[in-house]
Design a protein with these regions (language model features):
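Generic structural signal for alpha-helix starts
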Residues: 95-99, 108, 155, 171, ...
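Charged, glycine-rich active-site and insertion segments that engage polyanionic ligands
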Residues: 2-60, 78, 156-159, 165-268, ...
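Conserved adenine-binding aromatic site and its adjacent loop/helix in ATP-hydrolyzing domains
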Residues: 117, 149, 172, 176
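Conserved strand-to-helix beginnings and helix N-cap segments that scaffold or border functional pockets
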Residues: 141-145, 263
Length: 348
């Protein structure tokens, strides 16, 4: 991995994708021997590195240095800085076509027609051109049909990289004309190696691993995000540390004005409960229990699956209440009651 400057976000390099196993081996082989295809479909849940892999593939295809991608030649730098003239990036809400309004949630047909027109022109530098379509599932059906025509008659030297979290929303005929690159959650050991490579101390690395959902980028991001951990400390203190019903009103009142953090709070509670469950069943390091008050530590050591499922259901119910326009303070109070009920069983 590399960091371009002090305090900059860490950047993955192509070799970091060795953690994806056979996907990496096959991709490197085709890139190195020139047998790459004209279209790839890169799919994964959010945060697994689709955009990063697309950038690295573009660097490899356009690199003018040795050891592709070298990362230091003008082409590699331009790709990294998103200003290479032969890399076309389609992003929902940020149209290239003057006929498309900015801020649109989807990718309309006029945007794809505009891209098709660009693809038909000579490259600026000479050689290859790369077209990256982010959130490809956001193309409406006319847009997908317009892209399909181009994929059926590919221009020599042009490589399409379609990025999506929902490949099932793409036309089967588009999917069939792309080589699938399906990214999976990164193995724990790969994420820990990445954190160590960036000098993240051991305790923080374990915490970042427990909340990153298999995403290297997310792990590196939260490890350096003090505001994130401050909110989690607040959640731990207020939601897991509360010991008496008389404190519920006090806590709910304190969180009433933090409604903009509601999604994050519920995710934090869910993550903390999941960590307890994973520790209990040997899937996470037991040292993670040290952050929890003693009754919750006991749950993490001795709890049974029904207890964890009941707590997870309480978070699901809180989300349902929010969707039904229940006041945020009432949602917080109901969640606190559910947590206190379970905590009381482990306070003996």
């Amino acid at each position: 991995m590399a960091v371009s400057e002090a305090n900059a976000a860490p950047m993955l390099v192509l070799s970091d994708f060795k953690g994806q196993g056979a996907l990496y081996d096959g991709l490197i082989r085709t890139l190195n021997d020139g047998t790459f295809v004209h279209a790839y479909l890169i799919s994964s849940p959010a945060g697994m590195g689709k955009r990063t892999l697309a950038r690295l593939m573009a660097q490899h295809l356009l690199c003018t240095g040795d050891g592709k991608p070298c990362g230091t030649c003008p082409a590699c730098i331009q790709v990294r800085e998103n200003n290479h003239p032969d890399v076309i990036t389609v992003t929902p809400g940020k149209p290239l076509s003057p006929e498309v309004k900015s801020g649109m949630a989807g990718i309309p047909v006029d945007e794809i027609r505009y891209v098709n027109g660009l693809v038909g022109q000579h490259t600026f530098v000479g050689g290859r051109r790369v077209v990256i379509i982010e959130r490809a599932e956001k193309m409406n059906q006319p847009a997908q049909n317009a892209l399909l025509k181009t994929l059926e008659e590919p221009m020599a030297g042009t490589v399409f990289l379609l990025l999506t979290e929902s490949p099932e929303l793409l036309l089967p005929t588009i999917v069939s004309r792309c080589r699938a690159l399906k990214l999976h959650p990164w193995p724990d050991e790969v994420i820990m190696a990445a954190l160590r490579a960036h000098s993240v101390e051991s305790t923080m690395a374990k915490k970042a691993l427990s909340v990153c959902g298999g995403s290297i980028g997310q792990a590196l991001s939260v490890a350096a995000d003090e505001a994130y951990w401050q909110r989690r400390r607040d959640v731990m203190q207020d939601f897991f540390g509360i010991s008496a019903r008389v404190d519920i009103l006090k806590v709910s009142t304190a969180w009433k004005d933090r409604k903009d953090e509601a999604d994050g709070l519920l995710s934090d509670v869910e993550d903390m409960l999941r960590t307890l469950m994973l520790v209990r069943f040997g899937k996470q390091d037991a040292s993670l229990l040290e952050d929890y008050p003693e009754p919750w530590q006991r749950l993490g050591r001795e709890g049974e699956l029904p207890s964890f499922m009941k707590l997870m259901d309480a978070v699901t119910e809180a989300r349902r209440m929010r969707m039904n326009q229940v006041t945020w303070q009432a949602v917080v109070e109901q969640l606190l009651l559910s947590l206190m009920e379970e905590k009381s069983k482990w306070s003996m």
